Amino acid sequence: MKQTSKTKSADFYPYGRLRRAFKQARRFGLMALAAVLLPGSVPAGEATVIVMLGDSLTAGYGLAQQNSLPAKLQSHLRAQGLGVRIINAGVSGDTTSGGLARLDWALADPPSHVIVALGANDGLRAIDPALTADNLDRIIADLKSRGIIVLLAGMRAPPNLGRDYATEFDQIYPRLAEKHSVALYPFLLDGVAATADLNQSDGMHPNAAGVDVIVERLSPYVIELLKNN
């Protein structure tokens, strides 16, 4: 799956920028990395930095960048008077294994909070739920070891994979949230999945209206997390 990238707001930085920064740093050294990242930084105390670690649902597949979930969530939270900057660390097609592998680079601009929104592609590929659970377990443990506050966004298994698979997969998120004492948003696509008017023609990726529904339902969890932490 390919990600379209059209308009970018002045204060919203997609994950691709961090990847490019890392490649430049390998060539020119750590000073190159600092030079690329600092112009996008917000002075300490001005904004709470949140990373949204996910797949195409986060990246904004098929959407202009300003209509991606992180961008719209940032706008919504700012309209509520919350000083936040949300970094889009979504990579189309990514699995929990991919998210774990790139975790260090996703955190290159150090956040205080991370929304973990991975697992949709694990389900689509019928990956063993035990592996998905282990990857997410390691991601959350790593984030907590860095003192980062976590919101885990749950996913559900595709219905065509059978009851046994769905039962095992769907239990991953509440179990991990309880194990690590982190906040849980039960289902990232709540109110959007299988609703034609809220999805693109592929029936899998939310359109701009679908993203609005996600923001409306997800944002209270984020606001609660920010107020209490």
Question: How would you describe each model-predicted region?
Answer:
Residues Q3-L30:
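Bacterial N-terminal signal peptides that target proteins for export
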Residues G93-S97:
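N-terminal helical cap/lid subdomain that shapes the substrate entry/recognition surface
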Residues P43-S92, R102-P110:
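Serine-esterase "nucleophile elbow" of acetyl-processing enzymes
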Residues F28-G40:
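Bacterial N-terminal signal peptides
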Residues G45, K72, L82, G98-N229:
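Alpha-helical cap/lid subdomain in secreted, periplasmic
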